[in-house]
Amino acid sequence: MKRLYLRKISALLMMCVLLITALAGCGKKAENVSDNAATEAPTATEEALTPTEAPAATEAAGPYYSADASVESVVTDAAGKGMVGNWGLGNEYEIQALLTKYNQPTTYLSQAFDMDGFDDDSILLASAMTYNELGLVKNSYDGGYGYGDGVKYIDMNDEGVAMLEDNIFTTGKFAKENPETVKAFIYASMKGWAYACANPDEAAQIVYKYGSSVSADHQAYMAGEVKKLVETDMTGAAVTNYGNMDDTAMQQTLDLAKKYIKLDDSAAADKLQTLTLDDIRDTSFFTAAAASDGKFTPEKKDVSIQLKWLPQAQFMGYYVALDKGYYSEAGLNVKIVPGGGDIGETTAVYTGQVDFGVTWVSNLIAAKAGGMDLVEVTQVYQRSGLVLVYKINK
Amino acid sequence: MKKLRSKFNRQTITTILYPVLFGVLIAVLWQTQLLHKIIGADTFTLPLPKRIFGIITDNWSNILINVRATVIVALGGLVLGSLFGYLLAIVATVFPKWGSGGLTIASAFNAIPIIAIAPILNNLTKDFSKDPNIRSMFAKMLVVMITCTVSMSINSYRGFTELKPFSLDLMESYAAKKTAIFFKLRVPNSIPYVFTALRISVPACVISALVSEYFAEYVIGVGRQIRENIVLAQYATAWAYIAIACGIGIVMYVILLIVEGVLLKGRR
């Protein structure tokens, strides 16, 4: 019995020793690794990052940027240091367009789905959605970083590199076979969005009720910001026709997509360059839904919609339409399928796992170029919600 | 003798021929789209081999950059992890009372999923270097190292301790010192076990390198390309990188088998 006890203690001791040696091992390896990596670096970054001198104005008062620094000086400095962050995976095109606008290489750091990289200064110019990450950075509620006025941001809409984001899409085949279902779904969804924008606080509560990935406070903040994206276009003008597909904004999105979506598959890359607005969107369903009296005879009653991300106020219109019974009034039985992580909403819709999906127009264009028969039927967000946030010197 | 050799040859021929024939059969079924009918896929999610091969040849220089990054991480992690594992086994042999128990606990490290440790190590190595490429490569190597350490330490510990019957008694009857026993008996005895460990570690190091790239700060590597292309619905390109990833694993395994065959000739 005593021996067993002894053995247990010695095992514990051994574990401590192992841990310590493991940690010591980590330190020792440092030299090897940097050797390897140093030789790798020049080839890995094709577009060599040539460090540029930070503008004097930004360096004078502290480690960050002065409150009145120009967009160009901030972008040039951060890109020169190689510290511009984005999530990648199809979210990077607006950032690359902005970097190109200021003659910078289009490489960026891979940003995690939190703002820790921005917080610990490994990313100077971090991507953020106005309705999500920007709120977390500024506010000090649960999960927030509490920077308040200590940060400023660069708006893609102001810079002329905005691309359209959240829309509603389906497959060309589904739209052709179930036109009434598509119209009914658009009608009820946009009715939900209209209500949500008129009552953002209530909409936030409804979303929270249906299973939220974030706190109630953040949900309320998000609803307020999402409302702005639905009600304002890229030029800042008010939009009353919710869900309208504006040709100018759509064309700008397509043009930027053609320039910045890089596809290794030559067949897909060629197809991307030939795409026109008519290939990616069909306005007929939206026009018909807007003109209708709200009575539909859907061909398929049980439909589902795949969200691009976790349940949050970004998708409040759908949750409101479900909660207020707008979908059932239109003769539909709707199931909302949350996304998250690496769920490809385009693939889910294309393979028929779900009938509708919410995605960014650029992702739809990439999928279309890859050979998926997808078509946008409504454009919910009228302007880009993507910003680049940076800290300012106090 | 002659009969034996011909028998041996026939055996090696069949062991190579059958898998190759099976592979060719699958490739033919795949290209003729019969495979798609059997498993109910379409040519979009499962593109034809010809198209995949075309993408590989079109983007060869770009692919090489990613392959290089992945191989450096995999090999670096494999070497570091194996050396560290061997060292742990030596420590465990020198202190036999703690040794076996300690190694059992160490093997618990093997149960940590790569997906869980990769982002954590990413955050822990933020201060390592100012260059994101270097620090993210370091983080990736640590992930690979953790997966390679355990199999090496457990296997080589067995090699150090499970000696041939009476060989230890013989050495002791010669009044051999402990160091002599260690270098003349234990170390040579551990070599086949080292290769057993490597047979596990080599495929594992490629897999963990690919997965760690998913979460790395710096966008590079075969694994990262697979993820990007699948999310962007570029399945043909994703399949091209999957094929490359398989190639890396197979080539490294074959190299290991050849080295093992040369070094352990006549020992097995």
Question: Where is each model-derived feature located?
Answer:
Chain A
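Bacterial N-terminal signal peptides that target proteins for export
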Residues: 2-13
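Bacterial N-terminal signal peptides
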Residues: 13-22
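Bacterial lipoprotein signal-peptidase II cleavage site
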Residues: 23-35
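Short, glycine-/small- and polar/acidic-enriched structural segments
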Residues: 36-37, 41, 47-48, 54-111, ...
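Pocket-lining segment of extracytoplasmic ligand-binding domains
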Residues: 111-213, 355, 362-363, 392
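Secondary-structure end/capping motifs
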Residues: 177-263
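Conserved C-terminal helix/tail region of periplasmic/extracytoplasmic solute-binding proteins
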Residues: 250-300
